[in-house]
A protein has these predicted regions:
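PRPP-associated nucleotide enzymes
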Residues: 1-80
Length: 80
């Protein structure tokens, strides 16, 4: 998930510091909000979604639902 972009920015910088000929990035999910690191965006994106808590396909919700056969968003009411 590309959320705020700190990790992706660090990986890109690491690759460039080690003289990669080119660096392209891919993310399964890009969250749409204004908290991203400046100038960070993925070159390839599977889904673009609102800023919601997601689960399924390896992402858990409170320790459960990691094996859900899809990507789902938690209702904001349930995110307390």
């Amino acid at each position: 998930i590309l959320d705020e972009g700190e990790t992706l920015a660090a990986v890109v910088e690491h690759c460039r510091a080690h003289r990669a000929a080119s660096v392209l990035t891919a993310v399964l999910v890009d969250k749409l909000h204004e908290r991203k690191v400046a100038d960070i965006c993925a070159d390839f994106v599977g889904l673009r979604v609102e800023d919601r808590y997601l689960y399924g396909y390896g992402m858990d919700y409170r320790g459960y639902l990691r094996n859900a056969a899809g990507i789902y968003a938690v209702d904001p009411v349930d995110c307390d």
